[in-house]
Amino acid sequence: HIVLTHFKWSLARLKEAIENKNTEYHKGAALERFRLTYNLALETIRAFANEQGQICHTDKSCFEWVREKKWLDNETNWSYLVADYKKIQIWQKGDETEKIYRELRVHYLLLNHLGQSMTLKKE
């Protein structure tokens, strides 16, 4: 899957963005990279689902399908990931954006685990 390759590349860039200095510019760049990586995650999930005759119409249905495939643990709370993604779509600076920025490391770990699971299933 070429889309999986793009997703993994974006994950690497997200990790780099998170590790940058804690300036307004770098925070904005990290949040933008999170948005892009999230979109690629969904695109990748949909590609795998389509191969198996499944259609994910919503973000929630995509992550539920991933959980059914056991690519994420049942305890994984992906709903925070989805909620934070939706919040940054509004893109307002302030406390909420700062909170999401602080959660990016957790979101990265979840997305990275998902990417690793997809890679193993592909092989």
Locations of regions flagged by a protein language model:
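Solvent-exposed interaction patches of small proteins and small membrane subunits
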Residues: 1-123
